[in-house]
Amino acid sequence: QYGFSLQGSVGSKDWEVFTAILVNDRARRGDGADLVNYEVKFATIGSSFEYQYHRNRGLNKLTDDRDVDHIFVTRSETYMNVEVWLVERTKMIPIFDRWLPELIQNYEAADRQRFRRSVTYGFVRNQGVRLLEITGGELRYFLETT
């Protein structure tokens, strides 16, 4: 309909830029959270959001994730439906606290390079605040933030 191929998917940096514009934030320099005040995750609607921690920086990354709020962007396969949710760090901290001993144990094995966990779409909907919703290509909801 709009003249673009839907082969492949929108990259993570594109979702980070979209989110930065939406919440008036900036990219964070170096490793850690994606934006100064937010970690950005994206998935198709109904799917879980993956958190991945690499061996060399995993512990620092998990600590950084505890210190920021989290934005979750979901989309349909056609990109005609998009939801953006904000989950405050206080609601995420118990999850990260649960993952911490698992992360440490994971890296006791010398061959382990990554530690992956996920947050469910249901958790995001139950604990989050909806910031934006596009349905059928039409803006249906936008929460003005100050």
Please annotate each region the language model reported.
Residues 1-37, 42-146:
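Nucleic-acid endonuclease domains
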